[in-house]
Each structure stands twice: as C-alpha cells, then as structure tokens.
Amino acid sequence: MKIMMMIKLCFFSMSLICIAPADAQTEGVVFGYKGKNGPNQWGHLNPHFTTCAVGKLQSPIDIQRRQIFYNHKLNSIHREYYFTNATLVNHVCNVAMFFGEGAGDVIIENKNYTLLQMHWHTPSEHHLHGVQYAAELHMVHQAKDGSFAVVASLFKIGTEEPFLSQMKEKLVKLKEERLKGNHTAQVEVGRIDTRHIERKTRKYYRYIGSLTTPPCSENVSWTILGKVRSMSKEQVELLRSPLDTSFKNNSRPCQPLNGRRVEMFHDHERVDKKETGNKKKKPN
C-alpha cells in the first residue's frame, strides 16, 4: 500500500496548494475562498499564515506582456514521467490525484524535483495577458531540500481534454461519495501512464512565487505553459462536482508582482516584440 502511505505523508508534511487536512484547514484553522475565511483574510487566520498577507513573492500573478523578459539561457522543460499507481482524492477545496513512487521528475535549472501530485483550480489562478481561463492544472513536484516546482497549464472552454475523459467515471464516483456525506473520499485509479498528462510546449513563463493556499510559503518555482489547452464545459463542471459549493470556485486572486522578473522561454531565437517588454537593439 505504498500509494496510501505516500498520501498520508503528504497530508502530514505538506499543507501546500490545498493539500490540507480533511476539513480544508491547516493547523486547525479553516480557510476558504470567500467571506470571513476568504483569501483577503488568510494572513490573519493563524500566525503561521502571516506570509499570505505580508509576503512579497506571492502567487498567482497576472502575466502581462510589459513584464515579460525573454531569457535565451532558459532550456526546454525536461520531464520524465512513467507508469505509476494513482489515487483520486477529494481535498475539500480541490480535486487532486496523488501518484505512487517513481511517477517521474522534472529538472529546472539543473535541480531535480520529484512528481508528487496534480490538482485543478476552477477558474484559473494565473491570468495570461489579463485573461482568466476556465481552469488550471498544477503538476506539483518537490526537491530534496523541500522546495517546490509547479508546472501549470491553463484551459479554455473547447474540445474535451483526453486525460479527463479517461477519468470521468472516477470523478463521478468521487461526487457520489460526497453526496453520501464522505467529503474526503479517495478513489483508486490504478496504474496510469503519467506521460499522457505531459504536454510538449514551445513556450513557457517562469517566475519565483509561493503556494497559492495557506501557509503561502515562498519557495516555489512556477512554470506556466504558454499554450492554452482545452477542456469541455462539462469537464469543468465534473471537476467542480465533488466539491462543496463554497469551494467550486477555488482560485486565489492575483497578487502583486512586486518587481519580480517573469522570464519567457521560446524555442525560436526570434521573439515577437509584441510578446515581450524588452526590445532588442538593432545592430550597428
């Protein structure tokens, strides 16, 4: 039961990105997405959450053209994903999928991060050029030093997303468990090929930020894929269906950039000047 042991360890050691105990709380403090426990109040709910209010490297952000810098030293994302066991989990404030040992790794700036889980937010947390999308997928990886790397994909309403189509029956079962009163249900998925989740990209954005839920720790390397993917409206509702009403819209508002640098990778040396705020000088 390695997958179940890993889930327990994750619940114990990581209150990140809504990996929280069963009642959507950390350190015994309930947090939410509106009202007295909403994002604007997170920093005042518990001393351990103070960074949510005073941190200067908070996430998510709105990635604006004028703030983007093309970095020719960045490399394409190197990800190695494999077959592994998986479990779908209702985390009260989001739907997540935990992976067993050996799920894969991502290498960012010569640092290795191991794939732990993925989860969805509806609507998207990050905005791209002022646009908020229908959903956002977070692939969560952790390094040996405890820091995190999250690879995020934005989704617009359109054609069905193939991986979610495969998970339809499991998501329906997760919803049925909630209706029975089990608000922290777990549904065994079995062995899956995590390579089916990976998507190649010719462009991405990178910046240093934080967890998007309490305690909002500022130890996350964010990679936002430049290509916006599609999922159907029905799939968006399917992701929301296992959650209580107060968590169906589970996106934290965008946070100030505070002078941070948002870098862009593009596999072409020539970058459209409309995409970036730093224009290259013409040669003499």
UniProtKB/Swiss-Prot annotation:
It is an enzyme of class 4 (lyase). Residues 1-24 form the signal peptide. Strongly expressed in aerial tissues including leaves, stems, flowers and siliques. Substrate binds at residues 212-213. It is found in: Plastid, Chloroplast stroma; Endoplasmic reticulum. This is Alpha carbonic anhydrase 1, chloroplastic. It catalyses: hydrogencarbonate + H(+) = CO2 + H2O. Belongs to the alpha-class carbonic anhydrase family. Residues 29-266 form the Alpha-carbonic anhydrase domain. It comes from Arabidopsis thaliana (Mouse-ear cress). Residues 244-284 are annotated as: Disordered. The keyword Metal-binding applies. Changing residue 182 to A: Loss of N-glycosylation and impaired trafficking from endoplasmic reticulum (ER) to chloroplast. InterPro entries: Alpha_CA_prokaryot-like, CA_dom, CA_dom_sf, Carbonic_anhydrase_a-class, Carbonic_anhydrase_a-class_CS. Transmembrane segments: none annotated.
